[in-house]
């Protein structure tokens, strides 16, 4: 019989006594951050999702989307003032990094805290902790050495708590499966079968101890990293989801209950690493009673808090630049569309918060904001004649081509033209080659897909599911949201690597598919109210006479589940010639954009969960 282990995680945290005195003098303070979405303190304006009455613009009858206004004005910058950019904090952070490296390096049989009966789970715990706290970028070499050690003891039945453990352990095996798989080690999910009984249930005790619950938490987390055809992972997800939801109803409110709630909430394909770090900071180490382990969790926790807050000083500079771009480009005069530049910057910061990736964050925010304006222009505001003209002129890629365009289109043409050219120059600096024509082709394909959808709207044509879906993967915008921003990073993307992460790669195809499918399940009713009939739901119903909306949604959700497993495989296939590090940023763009549809259409109704994300990860510092 398999045994269950746990590594205790922590009691109430406070600042380590060695924190330098200058930091004690620099404490953050709480304040209310007003936004344009506030009508009065604590009261938020809910948007109308119905289509507004047609409006006249120079005698042209146009539709509007009925979206709420921009939630953020220039005053947002003053609320990003933070003391954590001062040298004292950075110096303290550097010392903590060295201390945590020593924690990794001190793991040995001579360390009294480790023994051949617990060293594997302890090693996995520290790797998992630094990753969930968002500080793993400092410890790449240490993580690699630690996981190499764990993998050297991996068997077809998994692993025990330590190298001399006689019996495999569910907690160690589940956490090992997840962590090793995410780092590209060839580990099979079949190891989980050794923890199932004849009925397919995973070995559990009636008492539901804390150790057992933590094991099931890691089983659930592992089950989300499933590959196609892994039935045992599906069984593990079903079992662990049910177990943890029932456990939440029984156990008192505690750091464990909060951790379980957070884990259930953080689906792998909508999980944003910076948001996960912010949430995990609140529960990490809250129940630790062992003095030595407590000291270790305190160092990790202090470093995580400092890293989180120090990054906000950089975000202030970047957001100031983004707001100037938004204003100088003339976006305030574009009143028919949604304005989500702050929201997109927040998403970028949640998936790429390494300081050196500034160009990626700003490029992603700009590209996505332009995509949104074009979406509203093609779907709602523009006439079919105007849109055909705009589409044709984009292919000329010449500022003089704007002479024949309406005023609002001239502005959008030049915004797109300048943005693509600017990011191409940045990409040339990073990659050492000119990528402008490559990027132009991607944007032309994207705009062609919008033009196709505009024609469907204008003619009332409802395509087949396959016809709609192939076009919809392009119009999802995933490719143009990811392509130029990743090329500006300090990561080499030679042609042979780029073709494996960009169109027409399987990775790009699946990431685009998820965004189209999930987006349609969240938007189809509102889109229909605005006159956009074509969606995955309506096209499926057309192809399957008699099918209801519920039937269509059930089918599409099943397809999404399969696509997610395929995307996992494309990212983590241990036999791939493309490094995970090259694929991960495209994958993370998928996660960020997918997050916007996690609860609803968070791009049209951005004053609920999306606003909360901005507040929690961009505007609010972590208290010490």
Curated annotation (Swiss-Prot):
Cofactor info, note text: Binds 3 Mg(2+) or Mn(2+) ions per subunit.
EC number per UniProt: 4.2.3.52
Transmembrane helix as UniProt keyword: no
Enzyme class label: lyase
Cofactor entry: Mg(2+); Mn(2+)
Compartments reported by the entry: Plastid, Chloroplast
CC terms in the record's Gene Ontology section: chloroplast
Cross-referenced InterPro entries: Isoprenoid_synthase_dom_sf, Terpene_cyclase-like_1_C, Terpene_cyclase_plant_C1, Terpene_synth_N, Terpene_synth_N_sf, Terpene_synthase-like, Terpene_synthase_metal-bd, Terpenoid_cyclase/PrenylTrfase
Residues of the transit peptide: 1-48
Known role: Terpene synthase (TPS) involved in the biosynthesis of monoterpene natural products included in conifer oleoresin secretions and volatile emissions; these compounds contribute to biotic and abiotic stress defense against herbivores and pathogens. Catalyzes the conversion of (2E)-geranyl diphosphate (GPP) to (-)-beta-phellandrene.
Protein name according to UniProt: (-)-beta-phellandrene synthase 1, chloroplastic
Organism annotation: Picea sitchensis
């Amino acid at each position: 019989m398999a045994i269950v282990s746990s590594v205790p995680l922590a009691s109430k945290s406070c600042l380590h006594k060695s924190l330098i005195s200058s930091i004690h003098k620099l404490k953050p303070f709480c304040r209310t951050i007003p936004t344009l979405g506030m009508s009065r303190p604590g009261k938020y304006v809910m948007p109308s999702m119905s289509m507004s009455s047609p409006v006249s613009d120079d005698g042209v009858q146009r539709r509007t989307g009925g979206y709420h206004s921009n939630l953020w004005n220039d005053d947002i910058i003053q609320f990003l003032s933070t003391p954590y950019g001062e040298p004292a904090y950075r110096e303290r952070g550097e010392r903590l990094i060295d201390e945590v490296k020593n924690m990794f390096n001190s793991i040995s049989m001579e360390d009294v805290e480790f023994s051949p009966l617990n060293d594997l789970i302890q090693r996995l715990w520290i790797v998992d902790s630094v990753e969930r706290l968002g500080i793993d970028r400092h410890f790449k070499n240490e993580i690699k050495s630690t996981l190499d050690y764990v993998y050297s003891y991996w068997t077809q039945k998994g692993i025990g708590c330590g190298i001399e453990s006689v019996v495999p352990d569910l907690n160690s095996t589940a956490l090992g499966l997840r962590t090793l798989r995410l780092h590209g080690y060839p580990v099979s999910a079949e190891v989980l079968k050794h923890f199932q009984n004849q009925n397919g249930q995973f070995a559990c005790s009636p008492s539901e101890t804390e150790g057992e619950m933590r094991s099931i938490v890691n089983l659930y987390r592992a089950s989300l990293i499933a590959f196609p055809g892994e039935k045992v992972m599906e069984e593990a997800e079903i079992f662990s989801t049910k177990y943890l939801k029932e456990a939440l109803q029984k156990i008192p409110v505690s750091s464990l209950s909060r951790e379980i709630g957070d884990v259930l909430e953080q689906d792998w394909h909508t999980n944003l690493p910076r948001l996960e770090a912010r949430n995990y900071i609140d529960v990490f180490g809250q129940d630790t009673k062992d003095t030595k382990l407590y000291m270790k969790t305190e160092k990790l926790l202090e470093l995580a808090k400092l890293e989180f807050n120090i990054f906000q000083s950089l975000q202030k500079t970047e957001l100031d630049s983004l707001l100037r771009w938004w204003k100088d480009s003339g976006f305030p005069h574009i009143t028919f569309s949604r304005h989500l530049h702050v929201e997109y910057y927040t998403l970028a910061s949640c998936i790429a918060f390494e300081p050196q990736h500034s160009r990626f964050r700003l490029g992603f925010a700009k590209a996505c904001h332009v995509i949104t304006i074009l979406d509203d222009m093609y779907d709602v505001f523009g006439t079919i004649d105007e849109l055909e003209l705009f589409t044709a002129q984009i292919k000329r890629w010449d500022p003089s081509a704007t002479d024949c365009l309406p005023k609002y289109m001239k502005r959008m043409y030049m915004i797109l033209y300048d943005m693509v050219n600017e990011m191409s120059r940045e990409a040339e600096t990073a990659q050492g080659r000119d990528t402008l024509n490559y990027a132009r082709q991607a944007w032309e394909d994207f705009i062609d897909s919008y033009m196709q959808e505009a024609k469907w709207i204008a003619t009332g044509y409802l395509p087949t599911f396959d016809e709609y879906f192939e076009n919809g993967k392009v119009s999802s915008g995933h490719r143009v949201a990811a392509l130029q921003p990743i090329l500006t990073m300090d990561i080499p993307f030679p042609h042979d690597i780029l073709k494996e992460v960009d169109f027409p790669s399987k990775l790009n195809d699946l990431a685009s598919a998820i965004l189209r499918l999930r987006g349609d399940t969240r938007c189809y009713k509102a889109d229909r109210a605005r006159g956009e009939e074509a969606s995955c739901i309506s096209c499926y119903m057309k192809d399957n006479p008699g099918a209801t909306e519920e039937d269509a949604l059930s089918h599409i959700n099943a397809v999404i589940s399969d696509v997610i497993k395929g995307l996992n495989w494309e990212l983590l296939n241990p036999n791939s010639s493309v490094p995970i590090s090259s694929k991960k940023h495209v994958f993370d763009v998928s996660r960020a954009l997918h997050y916007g549809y996690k609860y609803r259409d968070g791009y049209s109704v951005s004053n609920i969960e999306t606003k909360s994300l901005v507040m929690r990860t961009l505007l609010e510092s972590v208290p010490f």
